[in-house]
Design a protein with these regions (language model features):
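Extended, hydrophobic/aromatic-rich amphipathic alpha-helical segments that build helical scaffolds
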Residues: 82-89, 103-106, 131-134
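A short, hydrophobic/aromatic-rich structural module that often spans a beta strand
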Residues: 84-98, 159-168
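Short sequence/structural elements of tandem HEAT/ARM alpha-solenoid repeats
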Residues: 55, 101, 154-155
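Fungal transcription factor middle regulatory core
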Residues: 16-19, 47, 62-67, 110-182
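Classical protein tyrosine phosphatase
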Residues: 93-109
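C-terminal transcriptional activation/regulatory domains of eukaryotic transcription factors
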Residues: 1-78, 83-95, 122-124
Length: 182
């Protein structure tokens, strides 16, 4: 799996999200990422159970896109994460054309944030680097599979490859299991 999300950051944001009053939860960049994660998870759950449920994740996919478009004025890594996760989700549904388009948007959003540039010494250098290389690889693989242009010129980026780090599952195990009607 692509390390699009930092497990620790995502879990902390998720726990904060669950602690908020439901009435105070309008559109937010994190919410678009969360719905994208739910879309992927819903699809995996229905496949794992061997059921043909009507909820295969498309509703969450649409909610993620809706929240994403409502938050376009708030540019941040959540925009890149949402688009990249939705791209992998579309690919898992064998909708490679949609996946390629979403991956291309994720690359452009990452470039807009400067993730393609080497920022050594930055506090979140590793997570920025991981996210860039995830969207770069996702876009390149899809472009190659479909015979379409990747849209990334090698001279346009100098982001170094991130270090290999094993993430601790302990924080993920602490997260409450309540997707519910958020």
């Amino acid at each position: 799996m692509f390390p699009i999300l930092d497990a620790r950051d995502f879990t902390l944001q998720y726990m904060e999200y669950l602690g908020r009053n439901v009435m105070d939860q309008g559109p937010s960049p994190f919410k678009s990422v969360l719905y994208a994660v739910y879309a992927c998870a819903a699809n995996m759950l229905s496949v794992a159970r061997g059921t043909h449920v009507s909820h295969d994740g498309t509703e969450y996919f649409e909610l993620a896109l809706f929240n994403h478009y409502q938050n376009l004025r708030h540019c941040g890594v959540e925009e890149v994460q949402c688009l990249a996760i939705l791209s992998t989700c579309a690919a898992s549904w064998n909708n490679l054309s949609e996946s390629w388009k979403l991956a291309g948007q994720a690359v452009r959003a990452a470039q807009d944030l400067g993730l393609h540039i080497n920022f050594e010494g930055c506090e979140n250098d590793q997570s920025r680097s991981r996210l860039w290389w995830c969207v770069f690889t996702l876009n390149s693989c899809l472009s190659s599979c479909l015979g379409r242009p990747a849209g990334i010129v090698e001279t346009d980026y100098n982001c170094r490859v991130p270090d290999v780090v094993e993430e601790s599952p302990s924080l993920l195990q602490q997260a409450p299991n309540r997707p519910g009607n958020r």
